[in-house]
């Protein structure tokens, strides 16, 4: 019944719409009123405000496939209605990219098939590649970044093959946007040589679900001297680090990162300390004894202070969290554990002085507010170390 109303009445109704452009694109029935908008002052004014809103683009953005088909059909018939290029003309590549981002699979299939048909090509795979110029796999990455699994599957099936660098870029994009479902699909077809590359990228972005998936599928953590753990640590993805360490029964300490550095980073991460403790218990049996299961993270650090310092240089710049921990416990020491708190801090000071870490000693003196006991201990230690001059602190 509504389509039987006279044109004059429809023009009057449209004049009350806040944005007539949206109404005119929601159904192919309303397209015939577009040439008449200039005859109504109110509609013309509103339409002029939205002049940058291309009718064809809006129809594609909203997934109105019937409207898009109707516009194309009118163009083929060379209808006067769609002669204005500012309203009904738009670049097909941009429209295709919009569909990939918005998730309009039916429109993607339509635009794709129309492109092939118009160019009289029998090879659909080539046309999506050459006709739409997808050399930079732009449309595929648009679908990935917006999580449109069905579109990714369709487009990847339309492309004959990917070269080595395109495969790496696609893997990188999928992991960056944490698209696990798409990654699972890709993994079934990707060669094994990309597993470790994917693990490194997943550790870089902290994509824990993808990391777990790769480990279960056989990705090797120990490759390149546990470089995946190093990447996760350097990007502060401690949940990922905790998971990687928890999958290992024993870890040989890599030459370019030390357990002292790991402990400092983990102490700076105040979530799930119990899990961190359990990881340390499993990851290095020589340092962590099973009796430490009842201890806190701080107590584990204390118990292993001598082992952690072996062959390593502690300093306030690189290991501030660890030194702050000892200073804090010294300041807040109780009678029950006073001796142990003093002993721990003295052990740290002695280690720093033996390694000539003057800035770190200055830091401790400042943070302890020139504590007499600490100052006296430093002076006594300096007498044993001839090359260490305490006058620099005066």
Swiss-Prot record:
Domain of life: Viruses
Keyword line: ANK repeat, Repeat
InterPro entries reported in the protein's UniProt record: Ankyrin_rpt, Ankyrin_rpt-contain_sf
Residue windows of the ANK repeats: 51-80, 91-120, 135-164, 166-193, 194-223, 225-253
Name of the protein in question: Putative ankyrin repeat protein L109
């Amino acid at each position: 019944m509504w389509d039987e109303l006279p044109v004059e009445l429809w023009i009057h109704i449209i004049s009350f719409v806040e944005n007539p452009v949206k109404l005119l694109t929601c159904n192919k029935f309303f397209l015939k009123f577009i040439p008449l908008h200039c005859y109504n002052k109110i509609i013309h004014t509103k339409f002029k405000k939205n002049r940058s809103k291309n009718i064809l683009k809006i129809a594609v953005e909203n997934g109105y496939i019937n409207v898009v088909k109707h516009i194309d059909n009118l163009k083929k018939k060379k209808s006067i209605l769609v002669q204005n290029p500012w309203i009904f003309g738009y670049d097909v590549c941009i429209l295709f990219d919009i569909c990939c981002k918005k998730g309009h699979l039916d429109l993607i299939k339509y635009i794709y098939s129309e492109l092939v048909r118009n160019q009289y090509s029998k090879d659909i795979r080539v046309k999506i590649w050459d006709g739409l110029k997808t050399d930079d796999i732009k449309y595929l990455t648009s679908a990935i970044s917006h999580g449109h699994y069905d579109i990714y599957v369709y487009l990847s099936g339309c492309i004959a093959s990917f070269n080595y660098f395109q495969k790496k870029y696609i893997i990188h994009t999928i992991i960056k946007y944490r698209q696990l479902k798409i990654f699972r699909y890709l993994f079934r077809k990707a060669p094994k040589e990309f597993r470790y590359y994917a693990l490194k990228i997943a550790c870089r972005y902290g994509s824990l679900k993808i990391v777990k998936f790769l480990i279960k599928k056989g990705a090797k953590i120990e490759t390149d001297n546990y470089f995946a753990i190093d990447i996760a640590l350097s990007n502060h993805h401690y949940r990922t680090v905790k998971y990687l360490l928890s999958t290992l029964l024993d870890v040989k300490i890599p030459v370019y990162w030390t357990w002292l550095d790991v402990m400092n980073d983990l102490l700076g991460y105040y979530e799930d300390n119990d899990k961190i403790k359990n990881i340390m218990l499993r990851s290095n049996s020589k340092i962590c004894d099973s009796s430490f299961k009842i201890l806190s993270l701080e107590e584990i650090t204390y118990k292993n202070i001598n082992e952690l310092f072996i062959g390593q240089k502690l300093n306030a710049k690189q290991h501030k969290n660890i030194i702050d921990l000892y200073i804090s416990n010294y300041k807040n020491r109780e009678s029950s554990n006073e001796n142990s708190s003093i002993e721990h801090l003295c052990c740290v000071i002695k280690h720093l002085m033996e390694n000539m870490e003057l800035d770190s000693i200055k830091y401790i003196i400042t943070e302890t507010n020139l504590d007499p006991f600490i100052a006296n201990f430093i002076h006594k230690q300096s007498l044993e170390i001839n090359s260490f001059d305490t006058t620099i602190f005066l």
